[in-house]
Structures are given as C-alpha cells and as structure tokens.
Amino acid sequence: PKDFNCDRVVDKMQGVYIPFWLYSGNCEGSITAEGINTRTWTSGNYRYTEKKYYSVYRNGNLNFKAVPVDASSKTDDDAMDSIEPFDYSEMTAFNPGYLSGYLAERYDEDKDKCLPRAKERIENTTRDELRNTCNYNSVNVQSYEKHTEIKDVKYAMLPTWLLYTTYQDKPYFF
C-alpha cells in the first residue's frame, strides 16, 4: 500500500533459532498423464486451433537430502517453507554460545509427528519433477504411484530472522 513506506517498516528485528527435522531418503515414482500440444494459426479471416493429445508415462527415482520440516507447533509451516532453501554448507555441531543474543524455540513435535509432512513434500516434488520431463504445452497427471523410503533423520537448530512491523495499528511479523 502507498501509506506503508520504508521509514516505518521495521519495528524490531530478532534472530531466532528454529528447530527442524532434516529428512533424507528417496522416492520412486511413476505418473500416467495426458500431454497436450496446441498450435494456433490464422488463415485469411479464420483463426484455427489444433490440439494433439498424447498418452504419457514417466518413472524415476529421486534422492533427497536434508528436507527440512519445522519441529515447533508455534511456527507457521508456510512461513518456514517460504524461507527455504537453507544453506547447509556451514552447518556445525551445536554450541550453546551460538544462542547468545538470539531467541531459540524448542521442538515440541517429534520426528514421527513431522514425518507425514516430510513425505508429502518429497512425494510432491517427485511428482512435479516427473511431470517436468514431459515436453508438452500442458500436462494433466491422471495417476501417480510412489514409494518413499526415509533413510535418515537429523535434528537441527537453524537461524532465522523475524521482522516485526505495525501497519494500521495491527502487528505483523515475517
């Protein structure tokens, strides 16, 4: 909005360590789909559209490493998903000194409770990647078979930043 200007955007910014479960494994999947190629052209005063339909089958096996699922019921799942991807290249073993000056959430959802969400994310990504191998103007997935195997789960505290702001006397955080 026009009245939401940069001079008063940030009320407070706070570093917060959020607990995550990191799932690694693989998903073997296959899709049956309908691929459609559409061609449109004009001849004289007429516009023509030609559609060609194709039966499509794809299968594949995708490996996943460290798919994050937040382990706190206090954090919004969609908000946590929106700050991905995380850079794991500089992850280190936990040291309490890292928490100095930061807030930290504790996990209250164990790895078994978070597993369905991890599997859903892995399976949706596998389906989407299989679909993306279909080179048609549009692709309608008709069936999707999958088998997911989680091979490893690790616990991690990942640093995030929360931004607090007020707009029209209503508090928001991002």
Name each model feature, range by range:
Residues 2-171:
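Charged, low-complexity helical/coil segments in non-catalytic cytosolic or luminal regions
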